[in-house]
């Protein structure tokens, strides 16, 4: 037990120390003088890096770029059998699965209704999925940069930056070098990286077993750093070829949260308010720690169904309950979705924490860039409510918060919630949806709720007892992913454009609400809990909470 506490403290301490350092590195990347290679890329792509955009042009560029990324990935998956690097001769994906997968990776969700080792070729995994892992992560970073600039400038609607320049810099100077270095570490610790086809082996029982191989380490590196989460293998990081040792497990857990944590301090440096960044980071860090302790406690508790201590089903013995608990919380507070254990087999309360983390709109660390710009929506709402309470015009970092900013903030907060609840309600009423359940009762409801929470929250993890590879779920979850991603990005860019055309006051008035102290910390945490968590309390009571109490009557589903 002492060893586990030491490991947990090392993990949290490392996150606390390295997040501001990585944030400083990100800040310097976007201040860095344009290199010769970068100029060459701008020239061949016809990009003018000195031309700034307003929010409409920035949004249009982002949408067009992501659409063509989706379209290219869809074609790669659909026509997979005609493309190279397919030693297993896998056929192309059917249209609905190809559509779902292309949307999934283009929106940084990485929801997988298939097992990669038995469905996708090397080319599809590398040129298709891995490429989108880079681009979707950088897209989130671009939106955060635009919002940060909108807050930090005065009277300049064309000061949000250049989307194409931001995209190239984020990919070229941040994700590519970090992923390359991390992939080398992973290979050194035993993660597979090869173009060899599957190996046939004879087991101790005398049966033949097919052992799939592939370029795994290169995909794992970016899937974790980019908060993507989609695994090369169907069981994701539970597979020994993706995650062979406690060291690789620790490094991957750390890599899930480091860039989202760094984005908090990137935002603080661009807006000139590091103390405000620390206040936001403190809220995120608190929710992370509380989540880990709750999950660890309940997963280690007495299991009335099996009559043993601990909920061990679905967990790797080599990682244990603590590492499974840390990973579950880390992957759900971030929009990562990778797993080293099966969330469907967690205790009801352990599973509840994962669902709730996603339903908080992935703002506790969240995706690269996406978590921070999602958190700012809650920050703006907090500032507005505090201003109303004291009878002052709300201000945020020297800029007045008015009707347009609050409307867009509420839209960005409520749209994913509406999608989750509406699509879940539809699915429990449709026979095609219910036929995919392998579990009934409250756990069956939790599986459907988790699926749409994961889709709309752009997380990608699942309660895998739900057979999601059907036309109904492939299409419905794809729609949820699109609305959950761009239904937040567009309001954020509108806010960026609106704030950019306002004057930023450097003088803090006597009645202004401080966004740096303990009062702000408590209010922001309260708004997140009230607006974020209580929205889903009714449905959670008839899902995992009900299942928790039924479990003590020795009933399971």
Swiss-Prot record:
GO biological process entries: potassium ion transmembrane transport
Cellular compartments per GO CC: plasma membrane
| Entry-linked Pfam families | KdpA
Q: Does the keyword Cell inner membrane apply?
A: yes
Q: Where are the transmembrane segments?
A: 6-26, 59-79, 127-147, 172-192, 247-267, 278-298, 363-383, 410-430, 475-495, 520-540
Q: Which domain of life is it from?
A: Bacteria
* Membrane-topology annotation of the record: Multi-pass membrane protein
Q: Would I find Transcription among this entry's keywords?
A: no
- Listed GO MF terms: P-type potassium transmembrane transporter activity; potassium ion binding
Principal subcellular localisation of the protein: membrane
Which keywords label this protein?
A: Cell inner membrane, Cell membrane, Ion transport, Membrane, Potassium, Potassium transport, Transmembrane, Transmembrane helix, Transport
Where, subcellularly, is it found? Cell inner membrane
Q: Check the record and name the InterPro entries matching this protein.
A: KdpA
What does the annotation say about its assembly with partners?
A: The system is composed of three essential subunits: KdpA, KdpB and KdpC.
Q: Which family does it belong to?
A: Belongs to the KdpA family.
Task: Please describe what this protein does.
Answer: Part of the high-affinity ATP-driven potassium transport (or Kdp) system, which catalyzes the hydrolysis of ATP coupled with the electrogenic transport of potassium into the cytoplasm. This subunit binds the periplasmic potassium ions and delivers the ions to the membrane domain of KdpB through an intramembrane tunnel.
> Which PANTHER family does this one have?
POTASSIUM-TRANSPORTING ATPASE A CHAIN, POTASSIUM-TRANSPORTING ATPASE POTASSIUM-BINDING SUBUNIT
For this entry, the protein name equals Potassium-transporting ATPase potassium-binding subunit
Q: Which source organism does the UniProt entry give?
A: Leptospira interrogans serogroup Icterohaemorrhagiae serovar Lai (strain 56601)
> Species lineage, top-down?
Bacteria, Pseudomonadati, Spirochaetota, Spirochaetia, Leptospirales
């Amino acid at each position: 037990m002492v060893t586990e506490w030491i490991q947990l403290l090392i993990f949290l301490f490392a996150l606390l120390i390295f997040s501001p350092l990585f944030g400083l590195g990100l800040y310097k990347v976007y201040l860095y003088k344009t290199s010769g290679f970068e100029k060459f890329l701008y020239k061949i792509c016809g990009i003018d890096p000195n031309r700034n955009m307003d929010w409409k042009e920035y949004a249009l560029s982002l949408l067009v770029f992501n659409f063509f990324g989706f379209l290219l990935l869809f074609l790669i998956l659909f026509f997979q059998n005609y493309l190279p690097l397919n030693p297993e001769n896998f056929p192309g994906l059917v249209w609905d699965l190809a559509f779902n997968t292309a949307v999934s990776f283009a929106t940084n969700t990485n929801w997988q209704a298939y097992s990669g080792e038995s469905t996708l070729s090397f080319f599809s995994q590398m040129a298709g999925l891995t490429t989108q892992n880079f681009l979707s992560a950088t897209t989130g970073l671009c939106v955060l940069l635009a919002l940060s600039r909108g807050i930090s400038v005065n009277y300049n609607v064309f000061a949000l930056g250049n989307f194409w320049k931001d995209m190239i810099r984020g990919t070229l100077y941040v994700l590519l070098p970090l992923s390359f270095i991390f992939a080398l570490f992973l290979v050194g610790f035993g993660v597979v990286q090869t173009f060899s086809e599957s190996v046939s082996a004879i087991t101790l029982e005398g049966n033949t077993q097919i052992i799939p191989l592939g370029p795994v380490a290169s995909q794992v590196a970016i899937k974790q750093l980019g908060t993507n989460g989609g695994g090369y293998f169907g069981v994701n990081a539970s597979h020994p070829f993706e995650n062979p040792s406690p060291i690789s497990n620790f490094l991957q857990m750390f890599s899930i949260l480091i860039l989202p944590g760094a984005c908090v301090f990137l935002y603080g440096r661009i807006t000139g308010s590091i103390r405000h960044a620390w206040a936001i980071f403190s809220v995120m860090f608190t929710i992370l720690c509380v989540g880990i302790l709750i999950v660890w406690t309940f997963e280690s508790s007495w299991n009335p169904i099996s009559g043993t201590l601990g909920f061990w089903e679905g967990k790797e013995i080599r990682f244990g309950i603590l590492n499974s608990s840390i990973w579950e919380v880390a992957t759900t507070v971030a929009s990562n979705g990778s797993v080293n254990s099966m969330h469907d087999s967690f205790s009801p309360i352990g599973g509840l924490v994962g669902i709730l983390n996603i339903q908080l709109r992935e703002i506790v660390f969240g995706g690269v860039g996406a978590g921070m710009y999602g958190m700012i929506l809650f920050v703006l709402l907090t500032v507005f409510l505090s201003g109303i309470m004291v009878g002052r015009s709300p201000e945020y970092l020297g800029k007045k918060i008015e009707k347009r900013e609050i409307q867009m903030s509420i839209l960005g907060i409520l749209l994913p919630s509406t999608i989750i609840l509406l699509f879940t309600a539809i699915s429990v009423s449709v026979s095609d949806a219910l036929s995919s359940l392998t579990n009934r009762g409250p756990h069956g409801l939790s599986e459907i709720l988790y699926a749409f929470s994961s889709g709309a929250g752009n997380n990608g993890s699942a309660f895998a007892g739900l057979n999601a590879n059907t036309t109904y779920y492939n299409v419905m979850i794809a729609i949820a992913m699109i609305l959950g991603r761009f239904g937040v990005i567009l309001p954020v860019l509108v806010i960026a454009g609106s704030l950019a055309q306002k004057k930023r006051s450097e003088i803090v008035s006597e009645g202004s609400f401080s966004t740096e102290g303990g009062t702000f910390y408590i209010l922001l945490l309260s708004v997140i809990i009230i607006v974020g968590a209580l929205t889903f309390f009714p449905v959670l009571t008839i899902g995992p909470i009900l299942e928790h109490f039924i479990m003590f009557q020795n009933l399971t589903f």
